[in-house]
Amino acid sequence: MKRLLCILSALLLCACTAAAPAGSGAAEALPTAQPASAREMHRVSSPSGGGSTGQGGYYHVYHPDDAEYALAAVVDPVTGQERILCSRSGCAHNEESCLAFFGRATEGSPYVSGNLYVDRDKLYWLRSPTGNQISNINDAFLDVSDIDGSNRRRIVAGGVFPLIMSSGWYGNGESLFSSYSCSSYFAVYRFNENGVKAIYERQSTQQVLTDIIGVWQDKLLLSWREDYVSPDDPPEGSSEELWSAWDEACRTAMKQAPLHLAMLDADGNFTDTGLILPAETCEVYPVQGDSLYALEHSGRRWRYDLAASTVEELESMPAVEGDYWIYDEPYGTWVTGSYFTPGQDDYTEYWLNLADGSYLEPQPTWLKAECVPRIPYMIADLGDTLLMAVGCQYYDTSTTGQDGQPYTFTTCRFIYGLIPAEDFLAGSQNWTPVTLLGNDL
């Protein structure tokens, strides 16, 4: 599983100095030549960030053992069998002519890094930059093809890709959308067969706290916080008490700056809803119908009516000794997260339903670092079936270090399973095993 952080940046590196609306209020939309059709938005990247759900199952980049190339592969949502996307008879799946061929490794990196994103009947192929730092090697690209890999064509090629971007990608059947943030600059980019375009930009005198938080109808949902000044960091070597006081001062400063909810359409037209999100929000906002749900770290819960622009506070989640933290929205209005209990070294993992307040603690199925129990990890929602990491097999392997000397280390490969969402939420762990072509997804 790979959480890839990259964006097309030959266009982006100059963006940090681009003109953007001044002030801390809502930015004006950028002009566009022609309006895009009003098609419903949906998220195309999975919770794990490494693949996408579409016709036929879970699409992702597969790395054959000891091969210096990568292929497109699909996990069947019924059988759990992973297969190479190409179905041409006699194809060896190791040349550019293969419908599933993703790309070859380049000098400086033996690993082909990238993602596949399904947007209805289209498959997008996003190759990340070579290397661990900003790279000038022109091996990055964004392609689009039919869902079976045929009719593939390049949208953007070459350039420099910074490894800094949102892992969330969205589509409307005609274009892909993602965001980029660097210090005081934020932008939303639209990708389609006409290329790539910045449809919205925002700049601030402070760090820009803006993000895409979801979709509703034909619009992206944005959160943006007004400028505020954080206290300076404590001196190096400060006591735990001083750091705790600093953390509380940061929270107080942040709470004084409202967190706004806004909408952005496919052309970059920005609309502030007038709604204010919770001051200490957990930053994951599932949407169901016209309702957006929000949770504070304290457990307070809200429902926002996006059509009526109203908000109501719901019954709080059960009280816990620590704060609630949530990470993903894996299925419907369910979110996953954890809370730390004061005085404990570990944390408790859970699933929460922010619509009805349900609380679920799934039974652990694997051990982190071979000793810490962990619950199943969500990979993708395949309709009414969940693809999950349910185990971890540890093994020793060897590699060559930067000094040219071999060394051995312990790593793990995940074990995956499929389960009906209804069964998992009822407490079942009766998985259909996923059969992989290689070591891992």
Regions flagged by a language model, labelled:
Residues 12-15:
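C-terminal motif of bacterial Sec signal peptides marking the signal peptidase cleavage site
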Residues 31-69, 285-288:
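N-terminal export/targeting and maturation segments
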